A protein has these predicted regions:
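Surface-exposed, low-hydrophobicity beta-strand/loop segments enriched in small/polar/acidic residues
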Residues: 1-94
Length: 94
C-alpha cells in the first residue's frame, strides 16, 4: 500500500491535542503497558466526535494501517482517553 502524500509519526502517552489542523489518521501502533487491557479514543479536536477507538490486549501490541484516505479529523485530532497503554504511535498527514 502506498500513501498519496507525506505522513508523520506522532508518539503520545497522555490525553490532549495531537494536531491542531485538519489531518487524516493513516495508521496506529499501540503498545500495552501490561497493567490490563488498553484503550485509546481519538476525537475531533473541535466537536469531540469520537472517530476512532481501539483496544489492545494485556501485554500485546496492536497495529493497523487504514486503506485509501484513512480517517479524516476535520478540526484536528485529540486523544480523549488512553489507559493501560505505554505509548501510541499515530501516523497522520503532515
Amino acid at each position: 500500500m502506498s500513501y498519496k502524500g507525506d505522513i508523520k509519526s506522532v508518539r503520545v502517552t497522555a490525553t490532549g491535542a495531537v494536531f491542531a489542523g485538519r489531518t487524516r489518521l493513516r495508521g496506529i501502533i499501540l503498545a500495552s503497558d501490561g497493567g490490563g487491557a488498553g484503550t485509546i479514543i481519538l476525537q475531533d479536536n473541535t466537536d469531540s466526535t469520537t472517530l476512532f477507538q481501539a483496544d489492545v490486549p494485556t501485554g500485546d501490541v496492536f497495529s493497523v494501517n487504514f486503506p485509501e484516505d484513512g480517517i479524516l479529523f476535520k478540526g484536528g485530532m485529540k486523544v480523549s482517553t488512553i489507559t493501560n497503554i505505554d505509548a501510541a504511535t499515530l501516523l497522520i498527514d503532515n
